[in-house]
């Protein structure tokens, strides 16, 4: 008898979807790569993948709010609508758009202020993240949920005004936003450890931020702008694969 394949579902925003990493797959309005970390992970595990990630998504777009795609008339239903109830593994990377993380950094670096909504506080973000996790757990109670942090954009090798058009003070500011996102992830997994865990991608990728010898994100000199590149997606998939294998051995 053939062994049943693992069922993986991936939800989230652009750091899961992989805009500007070829090949871009349909629906193109999702700006989703066939080589994002969910696809690479599914290949490693020989698993069935339901990739529901959409670039630009907020946490509310995962659970309750439809999402309008820019430059398109495509409307995405809340991602949870297509979450299979028999999922074994769920990955989530989201929350940055709720605090204007990347959009605010790009706007600042370009010197072109964007009309952005007021960001959430850390408590509000952690509460919203926790609510998303709870809804996913209700929909797929047998799944292990991995809350996958964002790859680091700014790190110890990032040189002000060279690797990114931001001065030291603004780099410190945006590093603080990244830290806020990390703290919200930590808070969200508290009391949910029986079925959910945080994957500390930010810390593990600080040595591969802008200005490093092997950056896992694109900068202003090429690649996906302040987003994961292919090397970054491969790194996240590798880290997740190792974590899942460790968890599987612990269950034997």
Q: For each of these PLM feature ranges, what is it?
A:
Residues 93, 148-149:
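Alpha/beta-hydrolase-fold catalytic nucleophile elbow
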Residues 5-29, 99:
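Catalytic nucleophile-elbow at a beta strand-turn-alpha helix junction centered on a G-D-S/GDSL motif
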Residues 40-49, 128-146, 180-200:
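A structural motif corresponding to the C-terminal end of an alpha-helix
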Residues 151-252:
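Catalytic His-Asp segment of secreted/periplasmic serine-dependent ester chemistry enzymes
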Residues 77-84, 123-130, 134, 234, ...:
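Amphipathic, non-transmembrane alpha-helical secondary structure
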Residues 24-127:
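Conserved SGNH/GDSL esterase-like catalytic core that processes O-acyl groups on lipids
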Residues 16-20, 59-62, 99-104, 154-163, ...:
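Short acidic/His/Gly/Ser-rich catalytic and metal-binding motifs that mark active-site loops
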Residues 7, 88-91, 144:
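Structural motif
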